[in-house]
């Protein structure tokens, strides 16, 4: 039966036909991902199954509240999805309570702040310039505006976290919350040391494991538990799920406060299609293959860092224990912004990044940040990452010798090698 208000193609017309302009953008992005080497440390490549869940009818359902206690009817099936995500996450990380509703890592952090501290309270987090995250008290961020944010950094001599400084600042300022973790920390964090410092001053300890959660889940990195009172993470990055956030704890009291902070505190209806995709990703991470993946991510990062150092570049802290590294470009006399663009023209994607004690502006930088999660998902091993390291050195050396305007021949030659490498490891062949 036809109704005048009904769009005949609404339930049947493909995206390519219904919105060719947007479809062209998606097709272009698929081509970019297939044809370029992705080295942005915070990015990964999800499975076909994760994409199916995120693009499912779960997107239609509003579900304010929590499983079994919703403010809307018709939530039976989304309750199943959220419960699966929670139970799988608890199994993955060996913790008692999980909230999978945060829409992002930033909102997960905001949820912890809402739950455990008040505006004006003192927090102690890592400064952005040393590898911290905006949400750990950086001045432009809400966390830096609402709280008395004290910042710790790294040691000049080895760029490692300055635990003595953390302890001294904690004793001086008596923070309510200490935050461990960041966005550009290439070495494992001593959670036990942070716990001891927190206990000494009566602070709660939050670990932001957004970058390395997948390594924890895969047994390739120490867990923040039992040391952390609460942990936050994104669900993408090394965990290889959809873009989103999550909060984990072993404390029933903290869990109750976190649940109230997320809903109704800072969010309304959760994104049930994303939570369904989280459940899929967590199920994948419970498989034996994921343990092998996590171990390979670290091996690949170490191989890449080693090859870059052989090529005359410096690696901050002298290497990596994780999925990421900070490359100090100063030995070659080039800047991070120019290097990011030159590598991009050669189809190697990364991001400019400040290094500790960087003399350059954040828009320029003396370094780039590189990571191995996406390339490892694609199938690259240590041999491929050593080849990638040599290609990076080739572009950087060309940039140093020829300048930005004169490096086209080098970049084109490397782009051809990138194309050959990517062709050996195809992505999404059925899309």
UniProtKB/Swiss-Prot annotation:
Q: Any idea which residues bear N6-(pyridoxal phosphate)lysine here?
A: 237
Q: In which pathway does it act?
A: One-carbon metabolism; tetrahydrofolate interconversion; Amino-acid biosynthesis; glycine biosynthesis; glycine from L-serine: step 1/1
Positions marked as site (Plays an important role in substrate specificity): 236
Q: Does the keyword Signal apply?
A: no
Cofactor(s) recorded for this entry are: pyridoxal 5'-phosphate
Any one Gene Ontology molecular-function term assigned to this protein's record: glycine hydroxymethyltransferase activity
One GO biological process term: tetrahydrofolate interconversion
Q: Name one GO cellular component term.
A: cytosol
PROSITE patterns xrefs: SHMT
Which PANTHER family would you find in this protein's record? SERINE HYDROXYMETHYLTRANSFERASE, SERINE HYDROXYMETHYLTRANSFERASE 1
Q: What does this protein do?
A: Catalyzes the reversible interconversion of serine and glycine with tetrahydrofolate (THF) serving as the one-carbon carrier. This reaction serves as the major source of one-carbon groups required for the biosynthesis of purines, thymidylate, methionine, and other important biomolecules. Also exhibits THF-independent aldolase activity toward beta-hydroxyamino acids, producing glycine and aldehydes, via a retro-aldol mechanism.
Q: Which family does it belong to?
A: Belongs to the SHMT family.
The protein depicted here goes by the name Serine hydroxymethyltransferase
Q: Which organism is it from?
A: Cereibacter sphaeroides (strain ATCC 17023 / DSM 158 / JCM 6121 / CCUG 31486 / LMG 2827 / NBRC 12203 / NCIMB 8253 / ATH 2.4.1.) (Rhodobacter sphaeroides)
């Amino acid at each position: 039966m036809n109704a005048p208000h009904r769009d005949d193609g609404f339930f049947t017309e493909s995206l390519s036909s219904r919105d060719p302009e947007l479809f062209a953008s998606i097709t272009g992005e698929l081509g970019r991902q297939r044809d370029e080497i992705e080295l942005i440390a915070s990015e990964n490549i999800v499975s076909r199954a994760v994409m199916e869940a995120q693009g499912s009818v779960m997107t239609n359902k509003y579900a304010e509240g929590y499983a079994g206690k919703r403010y809307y009817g018709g939530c039976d099936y989304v309750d199943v999805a959220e419960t699966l995500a929670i139970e799988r996450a608890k199994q993955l990380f060996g913790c008692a309570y999980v909230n999978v509703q945060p829409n992002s890592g930033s909102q997960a952090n905001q949820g912890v702040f809402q739950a455990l501290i008040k505006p004006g309270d003192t927090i102690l987090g890592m400064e952005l310039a040393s590898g911290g995250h905006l949400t750990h008290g950086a001045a432009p961020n809400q966390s830096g505006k609402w709280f008395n944010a004290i910042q710790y950094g790294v040691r000049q001599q080895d760029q490692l976290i300055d635990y003595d400084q953390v302890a001294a600042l904690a004793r001086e300022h008596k923070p309510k919350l200490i935050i461990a973790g960041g966005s550009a920390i290439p070495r494992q964090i001593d959670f036990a040391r942070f716990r001891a410092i927190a206990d000494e001053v009566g602070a709660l300890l939050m670990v932001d494991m957004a970058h390395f959660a997948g390594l924890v889940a895969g047994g390739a990195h120490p867990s923040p538990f039992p040391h952390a009172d609460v942990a936050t993470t994104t669900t993408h990055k090394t965990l290889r799920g959809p873009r989103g956030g999550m909060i984990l704890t072993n404390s029933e009291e903290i869990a109750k406060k976190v649940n109230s902070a997320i809903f109704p505190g800072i969010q309304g209806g959760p994104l049930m299609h994303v939570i369904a995709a989280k459940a899929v990703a967590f199920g994948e991470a419970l498989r034996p293959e994921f343990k092998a993946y996590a171990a390979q991510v670290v091996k690949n990062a170490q191989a890449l860092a080693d090859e870059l150092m052989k090529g005359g570049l410096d690696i901050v802290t002298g290497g990596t224990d994780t999925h990421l590294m900070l490359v100090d470009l100063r030995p070659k006399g080039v800047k991070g912004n120019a290097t990011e663009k030159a590598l991009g023209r050669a189809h190697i994607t990364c991001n400019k990044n400040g290094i500790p004690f960087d003399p350059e502006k954040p828009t320029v930088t003396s370094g780039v940040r590189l990571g191995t999660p996406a390339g490892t998902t694609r199938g690259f091993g240590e041999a491929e990452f050593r080849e990638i390291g040599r290609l990076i050195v080739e572009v950087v050396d060309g940039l140093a010798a020829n300048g930005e305007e004169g490096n086209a021949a080098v970049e084109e030659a490397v782009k051809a090698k990138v194309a050959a490498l990517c062709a050996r490891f195809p992505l999404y062949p059925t899309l």
